Amino acid sequence: MILKSKDLLGLKDLTAEEIQYILNTAKTMKVILLSKNKKAPHLQGKSIITLFYENSTRTRLSFELASKYLSANAANISVAASSVAKGETLIDTGKTIDMMGADVIVIRHSMSGAPHLLARNVKASVINAGDGMNEHPTQALLDMFTIIEKKGSLKGLKVAIIGDIYHSRVARSNIWGMTKLGAEVSVAGPSTLMPPELDKTGVKVFTTVQEALIDADVVMGLRIQKERQKSGLFPSLREYSRFFGLDEKRLKLAKEDALILHPGPVNRGVELPSSVIDSERSFINEQVTNGVAVRMALLYLLTRRDSGESVN
């Protein structure tokens, strides 16, 4: 099997089979990641460029490490120190990178649709590392990988996503991906942070966290994205935590073996208290490790589309 597109722009347009193929490949990549040498020659001679217009620690670093673990040449463009600061357009920047022989461009941008625009104008494969409030497909893939690793499958699982759904590209990608793999997804958060289009996605929408948590197999907290919000969407972080914080008492409504996830960075004491973050039910650190494996898989699959090679 090969991925149909040269790019990974979102999970909305992927089939369930393609998603599962990526996740299966990530299993093999995790073996490499956990090996003593953490090195494989699969991407030798390939060049991976990270182009981030927004701040990032986990996503950018994991892509860079994923590239190096597979023996690719990896380079990061600091937007503030590049010609972008002089007014260069995204398309011109992309074409410049393209002409230097890049095989993959990993882009994060504040504008929804920026990766799609770039992909239409370059020969290199483009991976969406987060575009505005639209999608964050690699985060959702690593979330699903983590769940399947612990639960065996997503089919039939109840997944509760709690928090700022409106501004969350992570929530959107997870909704697309998890529902395609058979999960029952519920969301909860302040009514001011609920997007109107949720009715079309087949998820259950609640305005109280308690309803969403009942018998949940997986609970995912989302970061309050203050940088994307206008004032007045909720009174204060303290009030948010009071009504939607995932403390031990509320989490008792979920199943006893429910997984606790968060895409990070976590606002400790707001979305989750430290006692939950650092508990045995929390798999937040495992998500970080799995993120490298998933991104290794994507880099491999996108750069080997025309070769017919298999990693297995």
From Swiss-Prot:
Positions bound to L-aspartate: 86, 169, 223
UniProt-annotated binding residues for carbamoyl phosphate: 58-59, 108, 136, 139, 264-265
Coiled-coil residue windows: none
Pfam families linked: OTCace, OTCace_N
Keywords from the UniProt entry: Pyrimidine biosynthesis, Transferase
Its EC number(s): 2.1.3.2
Statement: the UniProt record of this protein carries the keyword Ion transport: no
Reactions performed catalytically: carbamoyl phosphate + L-aspartate = N-carbamoyl-L-aspartate + phosphate + H(+)
Superkingdom in the source lineage: Bacteria
Gene3D superfamilies the UniProt entry points to: Aspartate/ornithine carbamoyltransferase (3.40.50.1370)
Protein family membership: Belongs to the aspartate/ornithine carbamoyltransferase superfamily. ATCase family.
Quaternary state and interactors: Heterododecamer (2C3:3R2) of six catalytic PyrB chains organized as two trimers (C3), and six regulatory PyrI chains organized as three dimers (R2).
Function of the protein: Catalyzes the condensation of carbamoyl phosphate and aspartate to form carbamoyl aspartate and inorganic phosphate, the committed step in the de novo pyrimidine nucleotide biosynthesis pathway.
Protein name: Aspartate carbamoyltransferase catalytic subunit
Source organism per UniProt: Acetivibrio thermocellus (strain ATCC 27405 / DSM 1237 / JCM 9322 / NBRC 103400 / NCIMB 10682 / NRRL B-4536 / VPI 7372)
Organism phylogeny: Bacteria, Bacillati, Bacillota, Clostridia, Eubacteriales
